Every structure is written in C-alpha cells, then in structure tokens.
Design a protein with these regions (language model features):
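Sec-dependent N-terminal signal peptides
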Residues: 4-13
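Short flexible linkers and secondary-structure junctions
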Residues: 19-141, 277, 281, 323-326
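Sec/SRP-type N-terminal targeting helices
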Residues: 39-43, 56, 89, 103-131, ...
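Periplasmic alpha-helical coiled-coil/stalk elements that build and connect Gram-negative outer-membrane
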Residues: 50, 133-246, 357-360, 364, ...
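Small/polar, glycine/serine/threonine/aspartate-rich low-complexity segments that form flexible
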Residues: 66-101, 226-233, 267, 280-317
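Acidic, low-complexity, intrinsically disordered peripheral segments
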Residues: 412-437
Length: 437
C-alpha cells in the first residue's frame, strides 16, 4: 500500500520536471504560428494576392517574339524551262515582334479586376475564419486540459486523506484497539481513489495531446498549464451582441462577398453586349542569302533584307448567339436572388445560435455561482468531518460520504467553470471579437 502511494506521489510531484510552462496566451501564439489550417489558408491568400493584378484581368497587352531560320537547296539544272538552270543554296533568318492589346471589351476588364480583388478579400476572410476557429479550439482545449488537471489534484488530495486514515487504522490495529472492519473500509477507499487517479491521469494526458494537435506542436509534448480557470462574470446585453454579430461575423461577411462576386459575374457576362476593340501591332524582319557554285551563273551570290511595320485595329460586335449570353445572365440573376435568401437564412440561424448561447451563458453563470458555494461548503464540511472522525463522532461510512461529496462538488465546480468559459468563447466567436480579445 505504501508503495502504491509512493508511485502516485512521484507521478504527481515530479511529472512537472523537464516540462515547459504554457499560458493560454502562449498557446494561442503557438497555434497561430503552427496550426495547419491557418498555414493552408495563408497560402491561399498568397495565391490570390498574386492573381489580383491588372495583367490577370486582361488590361495589359501581350507581346510575343518569334525567330526562325530556314535553309533550302534548289536544283534547277535539269529543268528545261528554268531561266537559271543552276544549283542554288539559300538560307534566311526571320523575326517577328507582335503586340496584341484589348483596348475595350465592354467594361469586362474592370469587372474582372473587381472580381479578383473580392476573391482576395474572400481568401483573407477565410483565413480569418480559420484563425477564429483555431483560437476558439485552443481556448476550449486549454481549459479542458486545465480542468482535467484540477480534477486530478482533487483526487490526489483524497488519496492523501485516505492514506492518512488508513495509516491511523493500521496503527490502532497494531496497538490492539483497532477494528478490522474499519481498516478494510479505509483500505478499500484508498484503492478506489488510486484507481480513479490513474483514469483521471489518462484523461488529462489525452486532453494535452488534443491541445498539442490544435497548436501544431509535438503530440507527446508535456506542459505545465499556468493560466487559471477563472471565468469572468461580465454582464452582457443581447441586443449589443446581436448588432456586433451582424456587423462583424466572418460567415456573414463571406456571404456578402459571395453576393458581390455574383454581381461581378453578371457584369462580366453583360460585357458581351458591347463591342470589342483590339490593337494588333508589330514588326516583321527577314534577312536571306542565295548562292551557287556554278561558274556559268551570272551571279554567284545575292542577299536580301526586308523590314515591315504594321498596326491594325479590329472591332468585334456580337450580333446574335442564340440567346446564350442572355440565358447566362438570367441564371446569374436568379443565383443572386438565391444568395440574398441564403444571407437572410444565415442571419436568422446565427441570431438563433446567438440567442441560445446567450441564454446558456446566463444559466451557466447561475450554476457556477451555486457550485462555487457548494464547493466551499463541502470543503468546510470535510475539515469538520476529519475532526469528528478522529474523535469517533462519525464512522468511516459517514466520512466516506463526505469525501465523495467534496470530490463531486469540486468536479462540478471545475466543470461549470469550463462550461462558462466555453459559452463566453463562443459568444466572442459569433460576434467576431475573439481575435480582438
């Protein structure tokens, strides 16, 4: 029995050796740097920043250069109708520099640029949403682990108390004044508490692993959690929270962007009703040489060089396409109406979620206050019971009931503290303030 307590004491007292301290603030900082979801969304933001340019929108010209080199042999010696019946070798080099520029395409270029800007903002909002989810998850995982640790400490306190009572009964038995029944009862209590300790220790270790996963840290990394579970009992106004949510909620912002993107698609489609004006300009140059080794040829070699410039304008106007563009625009307008309906639906759903979370927060505040008083009372009752048990005023069964009430009230207090912190974090997330706070 002593060996069992030594092992448990060692686990409780020395498990902190070699561990780093971790506050909630530090956990969030690590998560913002290493969380995989955040890294992926930031890469997506970088892609959209690259794509958001006037060149991608089609505003800038395209310039191409082409260079070619040709060689040929022409044997006219057996051609009776040739005026130059000789063997000729020719070679030439040609080059072309061409510029293609869409000067006007029915305001489609501006619409494309606006869409690219909105896609960049949308990716940034998606990154913001990933950050909000990560912070929310880390807060809950951190306090979950802290709650498991505090419950582990409660059980360890009970083990020490049970060991104290067990040692007293062993001493009484050795002196011949003890009762075997009482000794077995305290031994059973000590074994039961030790079993609970191991199970609770496993729950604590698993909660640390979950926290490490969210932070992007090594899964088996061990921490000393330095931030306390201290819920802030602030009074909150539902209407204020509602207005903040409708103005700042990231999901609502993204839905507004979806509507705006759809409107840009309509503008792009309508640009087909306008003429397109294009400029094609450039220069062509070529240099060639013709030669023959025939001594009878009047000219042994000749060369030529050409240089041309051109600039052409084209106007393209679509007269009829079978109503394809008009059907596409009509479909986009219907999609825009759907997006508006989805926005209204989302707002109502979020208002409902906010209302439920706010009501739950108010209820959990009351439960926390009650559990806090209950724990204080059970702690005082345990101290009184320790004195009464020593003086024989209560038996081991009565004392065990008081111990279990102390443990239960402690667990309830930490659980209600966690629940209150969870509701507060969810309210911050819904109102778009979790990053600010």
């Amino acid at each position: 029995m002593n060996r069992l307590l030594i092992i448990i004491t060692f686990l409780s007292s020395f498990s902190a050796l070699g561990q780093d301290s971790l506050s909630l603030k530090k956990a969030i900082e690590i998560g913002l740097q290493k969380n995989f979801d955040i890294q992926l969304t930031q890469k997506n933001v970088a892609i959209n920043q690259i794509m958001n340019s006037w060149g991608e929108a089609g505003s800038l010209p395209q310039i191409n250069i082409n260079v070619g080199q040709n060689n040929s042999i022409s044997d006219q010696r057996n051609n009776p109708i040739s005026f130059a019946p000789y063997l000729f070798q020719s070679s030439d080099v040609s080059g072309n520099l061409a510029l293609n520029w869409t000067i006007f395409n029915g305001f489609g270029i501006q619409a494309n640029k606006n869409k690219l800007e909105q896609l960049q903002i949308q990716s940034e909002n998606t990154a913001t949403l990933a950050i909000e989810n990560t912070i929310h998850g880390i807060i809950l995982s951190y306090y979950q682990a802290k709650m498991q640790k505090e419950q582990l400490n409660l059980i360890f306190n009970l083990i020490q108390l049970s060991k104290e009572k067990y040692d007293q009964q062993v001493l009484k038995s050795n002196l011949g004044v003890g009762v075997k029944f009482e000794l077995l009862q305290y031994e059973n209590n000590l074994l039961a508490d030790s079993s609970s300790f191991y199970l609770q220790e496993l729950a604590f270790q698993n909660s640390i692993r979950n926290l490490n996963l969210l932070m992007g840290a090594d899964i088996e990394k061990e921490w000393i959690l330095s931030s306390e579970i201290k819920p802030e009992l602030n009074d909150k106004d539902f209407n204020t929270l509602k207005n903040e949510m409708l103005a700042n909620n990231t999901n609502i912002k993204n839905q507004f962007l979806n509507i705006s993107l759809n409107q840009q698609d309509i503008s792009i489609a309508k640009s087909s009703f306008y003429p397109n004006i294009n400029l094609n300009a450039g220069t062509n140059t070529s240099t060639g040489k013709l030669r023959t080794n025939d001594a009878n040829a009047p000219i042994q070699a000749a060369s030529n060089r050409n240089l041309n410039y051109y600039a052409n304008f084209t106007l393209n106007f679509r007269l009829f396409d079978g109503g394809k563009v008009r059907r596409a625009i009509k479909a986009l307008e219907i999609q825009n109406e759907m997006n508006q309906t989805q926005l209204e639906q989302m707002q109502q759903q979020l208002i409902l979620e906010l209302s439920n979370t706010f009501a739950l927060y108010q209820t959990r505040k009351k439960i926390f206050e009650l559990n806090k008083k209950a724990f204080i009372a059970s702690k005082e009752n345990l101290e009184i019971a320790r004195f009464k048990e020593k003086t024989g005023l209560i038996n081991s069964f009565n004392f065990r009931d008081i111990e279990m009430n102390y443990l239960s009230s402690g667990v309830n207090l930490y659980q209600s503290s966690f629940d209150l912190l969870e509701s507060n974090a969810t309210l911050l997330k819904l109102t778009g303030k979790i990053i600010q706070d």
